[in-house]
Each structure stands twice: as structure tokens, then as C-alpha cells.
Amino acid sequence: MLKLISRNAINKNKIILFRLYTTTINSSNNGSTIREWKKPSLENSYDTGIMVKNSLFKNGNVPFLISNCSEKNQRPISWYTCGPTVYSSSHIGHARNYMTVDIIQRILINYFRFNIIHVMGLTDIDDKIINKSKQELISASELSKKFEQEFFEDLKSLNIKPPMFTTRVSEHIDEIIKYIEKIKENQLTYESTKSVIFDVNKFGIDRYCSLRAANQQIKSDDTLLEKDKKSSQDFVLWKAYNENIDIDGTGNPVCWDSPFGKGRPGWHIECSAMIDSIFKDHLDVHSGGVDLEFPHHQNEIAQCEGHSHSHGSGDAESTQWANYFFHIGHLILNNEKMSKSLGNVITIRDFLSRYSANSLRWICLIHKYNDPLSFSDETLQLCISKEIKFLNWFKIVRSKLKLEQTSVNKVKKTFNHSIELLNQLSETKYLIEKDLKDDFNTPSVIKRLELLMKQTNESMNSIDTDLLFNVQDYVESILNIFGLEVNSEISDHNKTDESNQFLLEKLLDFRSDVKNLAKNEKSLDQIKSKIYQITDQLRSDCQSEISLRVSDIPDKGTNKPYTVDWLDKNHIQLLNIKKQSKK
């Protein structure tokens, strides 16, 4: 019998534990000066019951609390994601980032039933965009629009839900200028050669160190302005127009008028102002790649808090602009971070020309979202094999259910045959909920589903079909929550017009090749060799073009010394990987 514990008692204990827990936040950072993360007020927050890895806190997971909200969905979760700088095709390192955010949000929305307002910011004004437009002899605007469209087409191909709002730097110039003016009014800037620079020392070095300590290496995002800065950690808010640099591929200047003079926004200020345009001075969740943690996100925090409170104001120290930062781990290729600057990228479109979107989603699911992910043929082979394993299980279960429905000799199973699997299903549901509350631990969830499938296989012939249906339905529902398409039915390729047309053309090509061979070749050995080549090529083409696999078997008097299989895309991908690994 289950012992029920009152919700009030649980919540009371959680509050006591949390208060004890937060007294030691950031108290053991080996002498570093990373500032303390301030928990949202427990009296004015909704406790989701989820523990998360928050980059603002370095010593483990923290409770995920929705501030200014006493009841579930009293208000939606505010969430901002840094989008790409749209100057070239996105690669699978980007895809890992956005697909992982998609998975986490699907869990929150479809499993835990939270509402989210998701905003993504696109950088469509940047040095890289200007330089690329010069190479292609087009305007910076035309270039950025081209790659923005490609980016969102790629997201759709990957089954990644689009954000509720997309913000573009070019559409928020007025808001950015006003945002800088407010920071300037709060006495946190200085000007140098008509550029406006954020003064970290005036803001307070202890306040600044929200993600990284002051003694860690400072990396400037604009070497041209380095000589104009008072301190290496200072960063530019408004870049003065440079006629030698800020000209696009059509010869037009990329700049705007402002109270500070002609110029364009610095990189960090763009996100801060665009977030403020929708969410104002508070954000629940900010996500992005781990490479953006410093300096970009740390500078964002400083700007937003500097915008809300002036230098020396009494309540400045109590400010916490964003409560949670989720950083997605690097995608590693050949022991290096996948990066356009390193030139070691696989574009999303190149990947999808060979593999499915589901394959990439499986890769994301079996790795912890904030850990580095090593991309290799072995990783692909593992994930595709896992997907095939799940799809084959669904086919077996559905065939069993269909057979039971149509059988006239059905034997009624007793409940005793099903009780063990029923208990295993209940335990799996309980443990998977714990996994999802443990920082969205999808690798553990997948392992638990595999174990449940194994247990189901062992008792499939002795359990009630209603229970079998419920197990199948639960496994499918979890995969659907993750955004996986799990329809195990392979399309009837041999009845499609395309397949029939292909086979007809191949048959006629084969006839023509054999006729030419008979006419032109005189040596019997040469004829035999060429026929083998032609037939092998025909078999290879059938597999690659219409997923028809022909396998030879020893001739033992049968009229058909071969077998024929219609393959799904996953099998073809796996065969291709194995073939490449042998080369």
C-alpha cells in the first residue's frame, strides 16, 4: 500500500531545505569572486519541483522557481534564446543548441504543462555580415535576409518549433539607442573617439562577475577599440562609424544617426535592448551555447542591471535581472569545438542530405544537454541503431496487437500474467518523472524506456493486450514529447509511381547493357565479368535510390536465389556509416 504524504508537509520541508541550501551558494569557489546567485523569493514564487543546472550558480543544481507567480501558469515563463549571426549557413553545432532548447521546452510544455513565451534574437548587423556582403557584392541587408530564411527553413526541417517572437537588431535600433542613453544617464559609460563604452569598474567589479571571476582571462570582442578602453573588461555599447570598415558590398554605409554620433550597436547591447522591448527588466530563463557564457552573457547581465539601477543607487546590489541561464554544451568534432572560425563545420543541410532529423534528435537525447558532445561515425551509428531498435519494437508490438484483434481463437489472459509488467510500467513512469525533474535528464529516460521495452518483450505472449497497448502508448507518448516521430510503418515503396518508374528504367537500361555486351565483347571471361559488374551496380542503385535491398542466397534449387527487403531511411543511414568506416 502506498503511504500518502501531505503536499503541505512536502512543501514545508522543501522550503527548509532550500533555505539551508542557499546559505552556502557560491561559498566555495576556491577564492574566486563570482557573485552570489540570489534565489527568487519563496513567498512570491511558484516551485516547479524541477532542479536545474543554473550557470549563475557553480555548486550543483538549484530549484527552478517562477518568480512573481504564486500559482502554476499564473503567468508564462519568460525565455530568451540567443539566435545566430546570419552571415552563412548554420551548422550542426548550432543545431545541437537549438534542438536541445526545443527538447527542454517541449518537456516543460507537453509534460509539465507550463506556458512559455519564447523570444529569439537574431544578429543581422555585424562585422562578419559586412565583410561577407563585400565578398558577394550584395548589401548587408540582402545577405542577412538570405541566411535568416535559410536558418528558419533548417529549423523546420529539424522539427524545431519556431520562437513565439523573433527580434532583429536592424528593427530595434531606436530601442537600442534609448537603452544606451539610460545606461549613460546612470553614469556607467564613457566615450572614446565617438564610441560609447560600458565602464565595468563604475558598475562594480563584484557585481560584474556573475558568470566568470575577475581573475579569469578577459577576451575582447572588438580589438579595434581595445586601445580606447580604460580597462580590458570594458566593452562597447555604440561603435563609431568607420568609413574604411562599415561599408557593405554595394558601397553603402552600415550606420545610423544617434545622439552619440553615426555608428552601430555593439554586439552585447543588442540582446539586452531586444529582451527589454518584450520582457522589460526581468527574465526567467536565458539560454544559449556555452561559448556565449563569457563575455557575451556576462556583459548582457551588467548592461541590463546597469540599465535598471544607476551607479551608487541604494537598491543596485539587490538586483538580479535574469534568474536562470541554461548553457548548451559544445559539439566536438575531431577533438575541437565545431566552429565557423575553425572551418570544421558540417552544415545542417549537408547533414540532412545524408541523415534524418530524428537521428540528430536522438544524438541530443542520449547526451546530457550541458555536457560536450563528441560527434563521430560511432556516435551516429549508436543513435541510428537505437532508433531502429525502438521502431522495430513498435512494429512487433503493433503486429501483436493487430493479430490479437483479428484472432478468432483468442485466449483470455488472467490478470496475474500482467501484474508484474503493470508494476514495472508504474515504476518506470515514476522514475522517468524523477529524471525529467532532475535537470531534464533525457539520457536516463531513454535507458528506462529501453528497460521497459525489454521487460515487455519477455512477457509479451502472456500479458493482456490492453496492458500491452498501454505500455506501447506510454513509450510513444514520451518520445513524442521529445519531438521524435515514431511512426514505425514503412511506406509501401513498391506501389509508388516513383519506384515503378525507376525499376522500369533500370530494366530497360539492363537490357540495353546486355545487348551491347553481346555485340562488342568477344571473350567469354570479359562478358561474364561485365555482367557481374552490371548486376552488382543494379543492386546498389536499387538500394540507394528506392530503398530496395536485394541479397543473394546460395542456389539450392530454388527459383528465387535471392531475398528482397524494403528498407527504411534509418537502415540505409546505418549501412552507409558502416560502409564509410571500412574505407
From Swiss-Prot:
Motif ('HIGH' region): 84-94
Gene Ontology MF term list: ATP binding; cysteine-tRNA ligase activity; metal ion binding
Cofactor requirements of the protein: Zn(2+)
Subcellular location: Mitochondrion
GO cellular component, one term: cytoplasm
Binding site for ATP: 340
Major localization listed first in the record, in broad terms: mitochondrion
Catalytic activity: tRNA(Cys) + L-cysteine + ATP = L-cysteinyl-tRNA(Cys) + AMP + diphosphate
Residues annotated as binding Zn(2+): 82, 271, 296, 300
Aminoacyl-tRNA synthetase recorded as keyword: yes
Chain positions recorded as L-cysteine binding sites: 83, 123, 296
Record-level GO BP terms: cysteinyl-tRNA aminoacylation
Superkingdom of origin organism: Eukaryota
Motif, 'KIIK' region: chain positions: 128-131
EC number: 6.1.1.16
Keyword annotations: Aminoacyl-tRNA synthetase, ATP-binding, Ligase, Metal-binding, Mitochondrion, Nucleotide-binding, Protein biosynthesis, Transit peptide, Zinc
Enzyme class: ligase
NCBIfam families, alphabetized: cysS (TIGR00435)
Matching PANTHER family: CYSTEINE--TRNA LIGASE, MITOCHONDRIAL-RELATED, CYSTEINYL-TRNA SYNTHETASE
Family of this protein: Belongs to the class-I aminoacyl-tRNA synthetase family.
Comment text on domains: 'KIIK' region and 'KMSKS' region are required for cysteine persulfide synthase activity.
Protein's job: Mitochondrial cysteine-specific aminoacyl-tRNA synthetase that catalyzes the ATP-dependent ligation of cysteine to tRNA(Cys).
UniProt-recorded name of the protein: Probable cysteine--tRNA ligase, mitochondrial
Originating species: Dictyostelium discoideum
